Curated annotation (Swiss-Prot):
Composition skew (Polar residues), residue ranges: 312-327, 498-507
Region (Disordered): 15-58, 303-327, 394-539, 558-586
Native organism: Drosophila melanogaster (Fruit fly)
InterPro entries registered for this protein in UniProt: C2_dom, C2_domain_sf, E3_ub_ligase_SMURF1, E3_ubiq-protein_ligase, HECT_dom, Hect_E3_ubiquitin_ligase, WW_dom, WW_dom_sf
Coiled-coil boundaries: none
Statement: the UniProt record of this protein carries the keyword Flavoprotein: no
Protein name from the UniProt record: E3 ubiquitin-protein ligase Nedd-4
């Protein structure tokens, strides 16, 4: 279905980003399940082919108990002779698979296949893996016909019990089953059902042999590749976990992300990983887990637990390592980097250490040619040789192992996964290649040790200088402090190191951490009051200031000068978002998948919604709901007379370049005004849009711009501003047919009210009072002309005789002066205390009523031909303004709360977050233009976005996923829907959206 086009040429094709994996986080909100999961279609392999790199989709539900649960393989193959639902005799079928409980029919999980367009015999060939309990669960297959305009049509269902299903075994062939589609069991189900659904289903054989590696492996999760025989590789492990695995270690949990991939959560260290942990490597890395947990507490130092506050925290700088390895094709996975350190003022024998490492390296190579070289480097750092200096203990080296994000091309010095290791082994070309590889890795390892020793020496020099100076001026210098727990340090439990303190050149640089402020030191407090001796001040990565006591080697949030904690920072915005600071006590962070969430440290809660949406200065004034107005409007609509004996629609064919003249000619020529009350069908010349409400709103919007343009001389701006309009009393001098035009404008205003559209104009308050035939008082003058109002107020409150005024006013018409008597003989009547009230009343009547009486009479004549004037008298002047013109200021929070999402989008989707961030950064004018681009009108109804109207009545603002990042957004004004492509970044989305709004040219298709 076509839609409003942006009229802009799309940019070159951009790469589509890969989906981010979900990572378990403490208080980070979880998004709701997607409406339609990404599927793997077109796979026609046999059951034996699944081991060759093919990974089937898995259920989103993960049953994490080891009772009678097992894996069930489902392959949705084809459908035959389905029912016809589309008007052209075809359907767009897809299958929804529900995993339900037998008792209570409670839904556990749902997945969907892809939609096959315009066919009654679809072929899906999509495979799914469910973890089920056969005695408690069942599967329900429902076939639907996708419909983008209304709800999807039901084509039939199959209910499958799981008790007697076959199990896959080697040498056994399991056939496909064909099931007849049946209707729902509900009494009111009347859908026409026919056809069959072909399905393959079988339990996956789950044995311990499938999950256990060969006995020759030193680790249950890793395999070693023979370096001398690149052609021999171990068997490919099963692409999905099975029930044959050993039990998870204590504190671990198995989960699945939105794409069906299994990952493992370490609740002790609060980390996640793809590889399944075992009890062996869990115990061997317990101290590493403790260190990672400490790292986590430092990173989220705002809400550190009291039980963790006593732990000493190391501030380790990670050195980036240059890759001097020129051998192409090495498949290393950067995971961890090892950093060794020595306590301050302790000399280390670099040459001895490096020589011993080299000897052990060669000995290890000679003993076992199959050992992985990267494993040796990792183990040599975790288990140092016995002759190493006593100051460099195994614990200190082990604590230095930190996960870092290194630049591309940096070789790994940690154990790689079996697939990476196999890839590296396959590329081994012979003994010469192996020797060159050993030599290069050894050189790299020695170079890394030298770099670490040099960095430690620099750190010790900086630390010694800091201890000697004892002056606050050192706070302005950037340095790195390495602190190791000692016996006297372990007793201090009143503070906790808030974060790692590192130089910008060695600090992790991640896009996911772009909401944090880089760590820095400042000496702002030194200007007011110097810090005590041996104290310094720094800024944590989140922007909060903390203090360092070098005497006791402690850090604290408490300012030693006044005893108060440093204030929470207002998160610094990025340059593209000039939205102002966050409220006090709030912090913005970026989730692992790129979405932004907000932390309220006052209540210790997290949320996806930007708290600035509640700030009317940023998001716009809130729309006050009026129940009284709602009742009046319903009464008004019920008493409007419906036309009889008229055609189904009234066609209006116009040109955009002459919309005022064409509309005036068509509307003024209508003698039977009931025709104007029928359904409007607007067509713009040269455009193929079909008007189902959107084009009519566009017509009213564009015509309002022209009708009320002061350029034509019919209206003029009031003295207060340049957007509030009043009737030009000299309109007859600009247009001889001005009264006919005012009647035409009255008809347009009446048609807008009758059809529930809005005019893009705002009139002065006396204009609405004249429509309601209410008297105009002095207070109404204040909003039109403040100076004139102040003059009349002075006359009202003082004796006007000193001004020597008469009942006669001077009038300037196009430079010609003239006098107008407010009453007969007024030029000879002085204004006194006795008659000043009469004078003020006559001035107001002449200013607002008498001068424009003919124009207003023609306007009401045209308006009354559509809407009886007695019906609008139930409204006051404020409500009449909202009835005709809507609300000018747009409340983004109300807009967001009354928006629907379709496709894969939901309220917390990253694309939707970027969209609302862009809207929040827009000015009110740009928000109005966006609203006009999508709905056809720039005005909001009286009670907000909940009362937006579409082609068939109330229609909420809708955002649907569509297109590629190369496309511009497009709008369906008849449905108030914005088709928003999945852009790759916030700036790209904002730029494309602005260009689409500003480059909109017309309509094409249904609108």
């Amino acid at each position: 279905m076509s839609a409003r086009s942006s009229g802009l040429v799309a940019a070159a094709a951009l790469p589509v980003p890969s989906s981010s994996s979900s990572v378990a986080g403490g208080d980070v909100p979880r998004p709701p399940p997607r409406r339609r999961a990404a599927s793997v279609a077109g796979q026609q392999q046999t059951r034996q082919e699944f081991g060759n790199g093919y990974t089937p989709r898995r259920s989103l539900a993960a049953v994490n108990d080891s009772g009678d649960s097992c894996h069930l393989r489902i392959v949705v193959l084809t459908g035959q002779s389905l029912a016809k639902k589309d008007i052209f005799g075809a359907s767009d079928p897809y299958v929804r698979i529900d995993l339900n409980t037998i008792n209570g029919d409670i839904n556990i999980d749902s997945v969907l296949t892809k939609t096959k367009k315009k066919t009654l015999n679809p072929t899906w060939n999509e495979e799914f893996i469910f973890r089920v309990k056969p005695s408690e669960h069942k599967l329900v297959f429902q076939v639907f016909d996708e419909n983008r305009l209304t709800r999807d049509d039901f084509l039939g269902m199959v209910e499958l019990t799981l008790v007697n299903l076959p199990t896959e075994q080697e040498g056994r062939t399991i056939g496909e089953q064909s099931y007849t589609l049946r209707p729902r069991r509900s009494v009111g189900a009347k859908s026409r059902i026919k056809g069959t659904l072909r399905i393959y289903h079988a339990f996956i054989r789950e044995t311990r042999e499938q999950s256990e590696p060969s006995s020759g492996n030193s680790d249950g999760e890793w395999e070693h590749v023979e370096a001398t025989n690149a052609g021999e590789t171990s068997a490919q492990p099963h692409p999905f976990p099975t029930g044959g695995h050993d039990a998870l270690p204590a504190g671990w949990e198995e989960r699945q992300d939105a794409n069906g991939r299994t990952y493992y959560v370490n609740h002790t260290a609060r980390t996640t990983q793809w590889d399944r942990p075992t009890v062996l490597n869990s115990h061997s890395s317990q101290s590493t887990d403790d260190q990672l947990a400490s790292d986590f507490q430092r990173r989220f130092h705002i809400s550190v637990d009291d039980t963790e506050s006593g732990r000493s925290a190391d501030s380790i700088s990670h050195n980036s390592i240059e890759d001097n390895n020129n051998a192409a094709g090495l498949a290393y996975t950067p995971k961890t980097a090892a950093t060794s350190s020595a306590p301050p003022n302790t000399p280390t024998n670099n040459n001895g250490i490096l020589a011993q490492i080299a000897m052990q390296y060669r000995a290890e190579e000679d003993q076992d040619p199959t050992v992985d070289h990267t494993s040796f480097v990792y183990n040599s750092l975790r288990h140092p040789v016995a002759h190493r200096q006593p100051e460099i203990s195994a614990t200190s080296l082990q604590n230095d192992l930190r996960p870092v994000r290194e630049a591309p091309g940096v070789p790994d010095i940690a154990i790689t996964n079996p697939f990476t290791r196999r890839a590296a082994g396959n590329m081994a070309g012979g003994a010469g290649w192996q020797q060159e590889r050993r030599r290069q890795q050894m050189q790299l390892h020695i170079q890394q040790h030298q770099q670490r020793q040099q960095q430690q020496q620099q750190n010790r020099i900086l630390l010694d200088v800091d201890h000697r100076q004892q002056e606050p001026q050192h706070r302005g210098q950037r340095h790195q402090q390495q602190h190791r727990p000692s016996n006297e340090d372990t007793d201090h439990t009143d503070s906790h190191n808030p974060s790692d303190i590192s130089a910008p050149s060695t600090r992790r640089n991640s896009e996911e951490d772009n909401a944090a402020v880089p760590p820095m030191e400042q000496n702002t407090g030194g200007e007011e009051e110097p810090l005590p001796p041996r104290w310094s001040m720094q800024v944590a990565p989140n922007g909060r200031t903390f203090f360092i006591d070098h005497a006791s080697r402690r850090t604290t949030w408490i300012d030693p000068r006044n005893g108060r904690a440093s204030p929470m920072p207002n998160q610094t915005r990025r340059v593209e978002d000039d939205l102002g600071p966050l409220p006090e006590g709030w912090e913005e962070r970026v989730h692992t998948d790129g979405r932004v969430f907000y932390i309220d440290h006052n209540t210790r809660t997290t949320q996806w919604e930007d708290p600035r949406l509640s700030n009317p200065n940023i998001a716009g004034q809130a729309v006050p709901y009026s129940r009284d107005y709602k009742q009046k409007y319903e009464y008004f609509k019920s008493h409007i007379r419906k036309p009889t004996n008229v055609p189904n629609k009234f066609e209006i064919r116009i040109r955009r370049t002459s919309i005022l003249e064409d509309s005036y000619r068509i509307i003024s020529s209508v003698t039977k005004t009931d025709l104007l009350k029928t359904k409007l069908w607007v067509e713009f010349e040269g455009e193929t849009g079909l008007d189902y409400g959107g084009l009519a709103r566009e017509w009213f919007y564009l015509l309002s711009k022209e009708m009320f343009n002061p350029y034509y001389g019919l209206f003029e701006y009031s003295a207060m501003d340049n957007y509030t309009l009043q009737i030009n009393n000299g309109s007859g001098l600009c247009n001889e047919e001005h009264l006919s035009y005012f009647k035409f404008i009255g008809r347009i205003a009446g048609m807008a009210v009758y059809h529930g559209k809005l005019l893009d104009a705002f009139f002065i308050r006396p204009f609405y009072k004249m429509m309601l035939q209410k008297p105009i008082d002095l207070k109404d003058m204040e909003s039109v002309d403040t100076e004139y109002y102040n003059s009349l107020m002075w006359i009202k409150e003082n004796d006007p005789r000193i001004l020597e005024l008469t009942f006669c006013l001077d009038e300037d018409v196009f430079g010609q002066k003239s006098q107008h008597e407010l009453k007969p003989g007024g030029a000879n009547i002085d204004v006194t205390n006795e008659n000043k009230d009469e004078y003020i009343k006559l001035v107001i009547e002449w200013r607002f009523v008498a001068r424009v009486k003919e124009q207003m009479s023609s306007f009401l004549d045209g308006f009354g031909s559509i809407i009886p004037l007695n019906l609008i008298k139930i409204f006051d002047e404020h409500e009449l303004e909202l009835l005709m013109c809507g609300i000018q200021n747009i409340d983004v929070k109300d807009w967001r709360e009354n928006t629907l999402y379709k496709g894969d989008y939901h309220m917390n989707h990253i694309i939707i977050q970027w969209f609302w961030r862009a809207v929040l950064s827009f000015s009110n004018e740009m928000r109005s233009r966006l609203l006009q681009f999508v709905t056809g009108t720039s005005r909001v109804p009286m009670n907000g976005f909940k009362e937006l109207y579409g082609s068939n009545g109330p229609q909420m603002f809708t955002i649907e996923k569509w297109g590629t990042p190369n496309n511009f957004p497009r709008a369906h004004t008849c449905f108030n829907r914005l088709d928003l492509p999945p852009y790759e970044g916030y700036l790209q989305l904002k730029d494309k959206l602005i260009k689409a709004i500003e480059g909109s040219q017309g309509f094409a298709g249904v609108d």
